[in-house]
Amino acid sequence: MVTNISMADFYEKYQHENLDLIDVREVHEFQAGHAPGAKNLPLSTLEQGYKELNPNRTYHIICQGGVRSASACQFLSAQGLTVTNVEGGMNAWPGDVE
């Protein structure tokens, strides 16, 4: 099952909790600026790359605008992972980027 979280709610949690954030944008997009602490796992490599993820963790998934992350969440959920889609993606990110 996929859940969604608004950027406002996510950012509040992000500031106070140690969340697992996966950015599914392509490498060049990630390198141009990403949320501090995010791990890059591009959607194009997700079918193999997801195997690195711990099935006992909850992951928040982000992209640029929310479309790719929603697709990634559907796939990851089908693999048995617990995931939450961050709505609005980096377009809505209010904080600093690395």
Regions found by a protein language model. Give the residues of each.
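Rhodanese-like catalytic fold shared by cysteine-dependent sulfurtransferases
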Residues: 1-19, 27-58, 67-98
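Phosphate-rich cofactor/ligand-interacting catalytic cores and adjacent structured alpha/beta frameworks
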Residues: 23
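Short, surface-exposed ligand- or partner-binding patches at beta-edge/loop junctions that are enriched
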Residues: 62
